From Swiss-Prot:
It catalyses: ATP + H2O = ADP + phosphate + H(+). One of its GO terms (biological process) is phagocytosis. The gene is act23. Its EC number is 3.6.4.-. Keywords: ATP-binding, Cytoplasm, Cytoskeleton, Hydrolase, Nucleotide-binding. Pfam families: Actin. Gene3D superfamilies: 3.30.420.40, Actin, Chain A, domain 4. This is Putative actin-23. Belongs to the actin family. InterPro entries: Actin (IPR004000), Actin/actin-like_CS (IPR020902), Actin_CS (IPR004001), ATPase_NBD (IPR043129). GO terms for cellular component: actin cytoskeleton; phagocytic vesicle. One of its GO terms (molecular function) is hydrolase activity. Actins are highly conserved proteins that are involved in various types of cell motility and are ubiquitously expressed in all eukaryotic cells. Multiple isoforms are involved in various cellular functions such as cytoskeleton structure, cell mobility, chromosome movement and muscle contraction. Signal peptide: none annotated.
């Protein structure tokens, strides 16, 4: 998802899927104005006749031509602003390759002629949005999850861990376990339905085994009405789906769960700051929106941490957009000296981004 808007607003004024679609066959849509490419919701709605591409994989931009199309669409169609009139704050994934930051900087100044820009790490903005400058952020979106320890506003790169398990994988897993119940979801359109089921009905169990016992009765069953009016029933799938965050083996992955990854991240930090990290575990991103996730995280971290350690999980209700809300940073008076200006860029080239944004 691409989230855009104006610094200081309460929420992004536009949120659309970061996809670019191109017609599979030219000349099929006779009489319609045939565009070479479609972005976001329009690509999503016309997906039957398009080939869809995701320029962002696991949080990192891999296709710059398509990314440029997404930014163009954001400025001109969504926000309806001239990019040369506004400074731009972009966000990047933790551990984003250096070449990528330079490429983002170059496109903003050379293609869009922005007067100034800044690149901020997503997790750092989430932490700012929660009103903190020290803590560990567990950020989980659609394509990737990260645990990012931050001390006094600086991310600690040696302790950042990445987990390629996020919302998309959970949707796929839910598709799989619903198939075992006899419901078949296969196409991309049906995948969107399953994503909706996941967002509306899934939750994290505090004790998975106990919940499985409870679920043998129909106490936990919920019904969901499909777009065609058919009603399906979903039971233990509701908590089996997000359980994969804590037990990636459900997906056939050998990695540690989000609780263990958070713990491992903290253990890579200096012993003197661990207490501050344990006491400020901030959840962010759409995949942390499951009910029950904060309590479960607390329980699992408490089991891993030293027994005297005070653990606090912060799960703000608006955490789906907390990275975006952290962009309030750009409207602070103290931030104005931090922008990379067009003059600085012209003088130093794209590598300026490493000196000014960290």
């Amino acid at each position: 998802m691409c989230k855009a808007g104006f610094a200081g607003d309460d929420a992004p004024c536009t949120v659309f899927p970061s996809i670019v679609g191109r017609p599979r066959h030219t000349g099929v849509m006779v009489g319609m104005c045939q565009k070479g490419s479609y972005v976001g919701d329009e690509a999503q709605s016309k997906r039957g006749i398009l080939t869809l591409k995701y320029p962002i994989e696991h949080g990192i931009v891999t296709n710059w031509d398509d990314m440029e199309k997404i930014w163009h669409h954001t400025f001109y169609n969504e926000l309806r602003v001239a990019p040369e009139e506004h400074p731009v704050l972009l966000t990047e994934a933790p551990l984003n390759p250096k070449a990528n930051r330079e490429k983002m900087t170059q496109i903003m100044f050379e293609t869009f002629n922005t007067p100034a820009m800044y690149v901020a790490i997503q997790a750092v903005l989430s932490l700012y949005a929660s009103g903190r400058t020290t803590g560990i952020v567990m950020d989980s979106g659609d394509g990737v999850s990260h645990t990012v320890p931050i001390y006094e506003g600086y991310a600690l790169p040696h302790a950042i861990l990445r987990l390629d398990l996020a919302g998309r994988d959970l949707t796929d897993y839910l598709m799989k376990i619903l198939t075992e119940r006899g419901y078949s979801f296969t196409t991309t359109a049906e995948r969107e339905i399953v994503r909706d089921i996941k967002e509306k009905l899934a939750y994290v169990a505090l004790d998975f085994e106990a919940e499985m016992q409870t679920a043998t009765s129909s106490a936990l069953e919920k019904s969901y009405e499909l777009p065609d009016g058919q009603v399906i029933t979903i039971g233990n799938e509701r908590f089996r789906c997000p359980e994969a965050l804590f037990q990636p083996s459900f997906l056939g992955m050998e990695s540690a769960g989000i609780h263990e990854t958070t713990y491992n991240s903290i253990m890579k930090c200096d012993v003197d700051i661990r207490k501050d990290l344990y006491g400020n575990v901030v959840l962010s991103g759409g995949t942390t929106m499951f009910p029950g996730i904060a309590d479960r995280m607390n329980k699992e971290l408490t089991a891993l941490a030293p027994s005297t350690m005070k653990i606090k999980i912060i799960a703000p209700p608006e955490r789906k957009y907390s990275v975006w809300i952290g962009s309030i940073l750009a409207s602070l008076s103290t931030f104005q000296q931090m922008w990379i200006s067009k003059e600085e860029y012209d003088e130093s080239g794209p590598s300026i981004v490493h000196r000014k944004c960290f």
